[in-house]
């Protein structure tokens, strides 16, 4: 935030001190072991990097084939402590996890699908709490809407410098802090570790984090909250896209149910510096392509997802 900025007078108050994301690592059942070996249950950093590479780049079948290579049979060669794919995945699952993944089976009354519908997801509110309290972003976050001037001209930068942030703050309780929600989705199918079933990832980040930091993939400011199932219904092709769109909205309702409550009623959560804030979570942007934007807005593909302009009025 610029030094000469004028902040909204009713925003960003602190209501005590809590625990940030780093503090909660001590709650893990293996925290005492990781004080000796930070890569536990892996033997060392090198073994952790190997396991991470296998999980991120190979399918489960490929991991099994790799670990059964005769290259590992030589007694003079180092062999990883994990000897099977299941052992590796169990170790990865035992690593500290702040927001657990869930699998929910969904059904549409009156409509059958070729394969069962399974949504892999996390509670979006818990993911946002994790992001908001991550010490990695402590020096790169803004909590108050502001107006910055330079040479008699208004300066615009991140979300908190926009008129929208100021106007939303006017409707929030005294002292509240906005945590603007930014969603991102991509129809690139994900099949690895999903048994060959196609899924589309949904990502979330918060507008408090500086845009330059959000754009760096290595800092993981974008977090995956769900893998949307790609299913085929046993219906006439004319109804296929309608049912798929309805399924998408049903999944989003489930993933973001608690986050919508926080947007309406607010909740308290600690920031990276452990200060507790009264937070509201308005949705301010959804980054996606045009076909998906029309589906989200529930309009036909020839209509504008943002305006009331008709097809004939398009430039």
Residue spans for each PLM region:
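Long, charged/polar, flexible scaffold/linker tracts and peripheral helical/loop segments
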Residues: 1-315
